Amino acid sequence: MLPRGRPRALGAALLLLLLLVVGFFLFGRDPEYGLGTTATLDGDPYGSRNRSTSSLQLLLPPKCEMLHVAIVCAGYNSSREIITLMKSVLFYRKNPLHLHLITDAVARNILETLFRTWMVPAVVVSFYDAEELKPLVSWIPNKHYSGLYGLMKLVLPSVLPLSLARVIVLDTDVTFSSDIMELWALFGHFSDKQVVGLVENQSDWYLGNLWKNHRPWPALGRGFNTGVILLWLDRLQQIGWEQMWKLTAKRELLTLTATSLADQDIFNAVIKEHPELVHPLPCVWNVQLSDHTLAERCYLEAADLKVIHWNSPKKLRVKNKHAEFFRDLHLTFLGFDGKLLCRELFGCPNQFPPGVEQLQQALAQLDEEEPCFEFRQQQLTVHRVHITFLSHQPPPPRPHDVTLVAQLSMDRLQMLEALCRHWRGPMSLALYLTDAEAQQFLRFVETSPVLSARKDVAYHVVYRDGPLYPVNQLRNVALAQALTPYVFLSDIDFLPAYSLYDYLRASIEQLALGRRQRKAALVVPAFETLHYRFSFPNSKAELLTLLDAGSLHTFRYHEWPQGHASTDYTRWREAQAPYRVQWSADYEPYVVVPRDCPRYDPRFVGFGWNKVAHIIELDAQEYEFLVLPEAFSIHLPHAPSLDISRFRSSPTYRDCLQALKEEFHQDLSRRYGSAALKYLTALQQSRSRA
């Protein structure tokens, strides 16, 4: 697997090198800085504070020493930021990492799934509940936009394991352009009394001269910025850090109403009183791009940059002389394929996450010359998954509520706005995207008034990996994240009737599915139009008129009639009440089922039989199929996907699909015994007809 990803990784490395060269010409030739002098801020009263790391003799840690990093992360936005931060760290790192993540419930749910599916070697992740820390800092008034989470770095020494001696603490809005090992090595320059390493604040905030009557917290000179911190934890315990910062904060709050910069104000107040505790770090380890930054005095040339800190509320939109260069560096990692960072640290033992070695062994046993190799490989692929990629407000619990579940790729984004107009209830959608496409999708939603207004739609990004579309894996991701008792298993190219959401909830209640524990799959009849523009029917009566006029058709009536034949459209035309239908070969209706229904079979990738296998599973588990008389959904025309084109043109593709069908039936026989015989018989009959 490594040789296949190497050209892409090399390309990304060359792009970063190009950015550094451009930066040299941007910064290195500017006479304001000069190439032969050391960058300082106002004469650098601490001497070594602003020296580039290259001017220090680094005491690098052993090759396989574990480096510990602590990050406070809460909410949906920070959960996206931390991924870009980690990409930049992983790109340069040469040491194993142990991440200590202080998270709320939202971030933990997202990041546990992400790191479990990312499967990066030599990375250990531990989680700590931020809710348990809130009482420790909730007494501190804070005006900073980060709220209570912005104060939690103060209590890290009492939260992290006692066995942990040192830790690097990072904000989520920083980007590395160097090996984090070099930052860790700066612990070796601490004196015996120094317990915290910080970069000087690169603005005049703590000088109190930014505007009239500006009264900041006390600080030593310009003060220090806490976006990047080296904490010597056992020394902090020895000096009574908890009592020290609390006494300082309580004293200052007698005259200052609140903190403005969260933990940073309190760190600076303590350092003002105890300057011997701080070890000033070279400024290049925290180049701060705030609204009033003086950071350009720090860097001499692009190669000096170690960490970029987007510490303005405006983030990437901040005004800065060299903002475009910094943004390009950040955007490089934003769109970088995270799969390419799953490389081994050669020579370091015990570095694989659980399951990786077994997966590698299974992949190694595959024969690349075998005709169905792509199918076998895709089945074994573990995709990175970022659940709830955007802000999400779950609906309040209701006993008969229904979530629409679907999956899509980048070429179907245009369906989302129409779908939101048709379906008023919650949705759980899985999107198959590259890292770069995920950022395009983010901007697409943010700029759409329709999509940005819908907070009950949960988007889950499954990152692309492999040549075949993992349709059932995507469905399972979306299904697993549905929060309502029932789910409508649909496809992205279908628009449901405007009234379908309310009608489904009413039908579930009338049929008493919940009270009777009835195993039922409610069938939503599927239709299609071949016109890109048509008047969507508001009722069953209008739909029948369009059907009779030839503007609508039963779904796939001319290509795959057996797929929906059991729905019995002739009976549906006159039906006034739900009616039961029997399973038949190749039946694949769109159904409403309980959330805990069987999952889709992930072996089916690409085109063909992915829904059919799921309906067989429902029938094998004795679900009854009930067709709803007033429900309908209409498929809109679109260009054929790559997978359906391959299915139509490649005999090998069709042979591989047939092999998957046979394996599926063998598994059915093992699980259901003689009850599964009817499915195998139906398969053999359909094969003889073909």
From Swiss-Prot:
Topology in the lipid bilayer: Single-pass type II membrane protein
Cytoplasmic domain ranges by topology: 1-7
Reactions performed catalytically: 3-O-[beta-D-GlcA-(1->3)-beta-D-Xyl-(1->4)-Rib-ol-P-Rib-ol-P-3-beta-D-GalNAc-(1->3)-beta-D-GlcNAc-(1->4)-(O-6-P-alpha-D-Man)]-Thr-[protein] + UDP-alpha-D-xylose = 3-O-[alpha-D-Xyl-(1->3)-beta-D-GlcA-(1->4)-beta-D-Xyl-(1->4)-Rib-ol-P-Rib-ol-P-3-beta-D-GalNAc-(1->3)-beta-D-GlcNAc-(1->4)-(O-6-P-alpha-D-Man)]-Thr-[protein] + UDP + H(+); 3-O-{(1->[3)-alpha-D-Xyl-(1->3)-beta-D-GlcA-(1->](n)-4)-beta-D-Xyl-(1->4)-Rib-ol-P-Rib-ol-P-3-beta-D-GalNAc-(1->3)-beta-D-GlcNAc-(1->4)-O-6-P-alpha-D-Man}-L-Thr-[protein] + UDP-alpha-D-glucuronate = 3-O-{beta-D-GlcA-(1->[3)-alpha-D-Xyl-(1->3)-beta-D-GlcA-(1->](n)-4)-beta-D-Xyl-(1->4)-Rib-ol-P-Rib-ol-P-3-beta-D-GalNAc-(1->3)-beta-D-GlcNAc-(1->4)-O-6-P-alpha-D-Man}-L-Thr-[protein] + UDP + H(+); 3-O-{beta-D-GlcA-(1->[3)-alpha-D-Xyl-(1->3)-beta-D-GlcA-(1->](n)-4)-beta-D-Xyl-(1->4)-Rib-ol-P-Rib-ol-P-3-beta-D-GalNAc-(1->3)-beta-D-GlcNAc-(1->4)-O-6-P-alpha-D-Man}-L-Thr-[protein] + UDP-alpha-D-xylose = 3-O-{(1->[3)-alpha-D-Xyl-(1->3)-beta-D-GlcA-(1->](n+1)-4)-beta-D-Xyl-(1->4)-Rib-ol-P-Rib-ol-P-3-beta-D-GalNAc-(1->3)-beta-D-GlcNAc-(1->4)-O-6-P-alpha-D-Man}-L-Thr-[protein] + UDP + H(+)
Keyword entries, A-Z: Glycoprotein, Glycosyltransferase, Golgi apparatus, Manganese, Membrane, Metal-binding, Multifunctional enzyme, Signal-anchor, Transferase, Transmembrane, Transmembrane helix
Cofactor note: Binds 2 Mn(2+) ions per subunit. The xylosyltransferase part binds one Mn(2+) and the beta-1,3-glucuronyltransferase part binds one Mn(2+).
Lumenal side, ranges: 29-690
Its biological purpose: Bifunctional glycosyltransferase with both alpha-1,3-xylosyltransferase and beta-1,3-glucuronyltransferase activities involved in the maturation of alpha-dystroglycan (DAG1) by glycosylation leading to DAG1 binding to laminin G-like domain-containing extracellular proteins with high affinity and in a phosphorylated-O-mannosyl trisaccharide dependent manner. Elongates the glucuronyl-beta-1,4-xylose-beta disaccharide primer structure by adding repeating units [-3-Xylose-alpha-1,3-GlcA-beta-1-] to produce a heteropolysaccharide. Supports the maturation of DAG1 more effectively than LARGE1.
Protein's name in the database: Xylosyl- and glucuronyltransferase LARGE2
Gene source species: Rattus norvegicus
